């Protein structure tokens, strides 16, 4: 009896081991199935893979053997007048047409009946050249008596009779008014104080910009720039 039991003991041990291994493998499979993550379309890799679209042929570089001038025309029929001036040969008549178009005035200037005859004669003489530019005639319409009056008004009330007011009244430039007279010293001091109060409200960036502009102006007057 004991001999028979000793014979069956290794078989029982093997069966027990097989049962244990099968149970452990089944539990591992169940755990693995329970822990599997489902991947949807919102996964980063899949989205990146879908967006990885090859570029269009128009974005690709042209091979060296196929170098050419690229011209993207609009949605209309191409015209010969679109050829750049640099790419036209010297014997091409379009160069002369382009030069004429460059020097042609954009619109006809306003002319008076007196100047129309002279302009017509000049046009016949010079051909299709641009119109002649004339310097404006200087008008000396302020008399010495008016200059004295300007000085009196400026000294009387510099706030009311400002440079702009006097230039409009006597039909002259602001530079001429400032050449004729200057504001009283008290008015100049008040103007400086007002500018100083305005500068106090500036931020650091604007103050630095004003300082740089003042330095550049001084360097320009000294001929350094």
Swiss-Prot record:
MF (Gene Ontology): structural constituent of ribosome
What's in the keyword line of the UniProt record?
Answer: Mitochondrion, Ribonucleoprotein, Ribosomal protein
Superkingdom, natural source: Eukaryota
Q: Where is this region: Disordered?
A: 106-138
Its subunit composition reads: Component of the mitochondrial large ribosomal subunit (mt-LSU). Mature N.crassa 74S mitochondrial ribosomes consist of a small (37S) and a large (54S) subunit. The 37S small subunit contains a 16S ribosomal RNA (16S mt-rRNA) and 32 different proteins. The 54S large subunit contains a 23S rRNA (23S mt-rRNA) and 42 different proteins.
Per the entry, what this protein does is: Component of the mitochondrial ribosome (mitoribosome), a dedicated translation machinery responsible for the synthesis of mitochondrial genome-encoded proteins, including at least some of the essential transmembrane subunits of the mitochondrial respiratory chain. The mitoribosomes are attached to the mitochondrial inner membrane and translation products are cotranslationally integrated into the membrane.
- Identification of the protein by name: Large ribosomal subunit protein mL58
Q: What is the lineage of its organism?
A: Eukaryota, Fungi, Dikarya, Ascomycota, Pezizomycotina
């Amino acid at each position: 009896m004991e001999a028979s039991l000793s014979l069956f003991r290794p078989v029982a041990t093997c069966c027990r081991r097989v049962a244990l291994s099968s149970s452990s493998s089944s539990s591992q499979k169940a755990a693995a199935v329970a822990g599997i993550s489902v991947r949807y379309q919102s996964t980063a890799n899949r989205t990146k893979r879908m967006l990885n679209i090859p570029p269009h042929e128009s974005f690709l570089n042209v091979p060296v053997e196929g170098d050419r001038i690229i011209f993207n025309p609009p949605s209309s029929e191409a015209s010969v007048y679109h050829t750049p001036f640099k790419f036209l040969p010297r014997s091409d008549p379009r160069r002369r047409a382009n030069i004429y178009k460059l020097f042609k005035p954009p619109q006809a200037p306003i002319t008076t009946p007196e100047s129309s005859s002279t302009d017509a004669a000049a046009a016949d003489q010079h051909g299709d050249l641009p119109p002649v530019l004339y310097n404006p005639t200087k008008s000396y319409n302020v008399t010495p008596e008016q200059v004295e009056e300007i000085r009196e008004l400026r000294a009387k009330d510099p706030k009311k009779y400002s440079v702009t007011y006097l230039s409009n009244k006597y039909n002259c430039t602001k530079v001429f008014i400032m050449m004729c007279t200057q504001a009283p010293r008290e008015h100049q001091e008040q103007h400086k104080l007002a500018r100083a109060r305005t500068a106090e409200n500036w931020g650091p960036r604007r103050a630095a910009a004003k300082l740089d502009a003042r330095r550049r102006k001084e360097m320009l007057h000294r001929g350094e720039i």
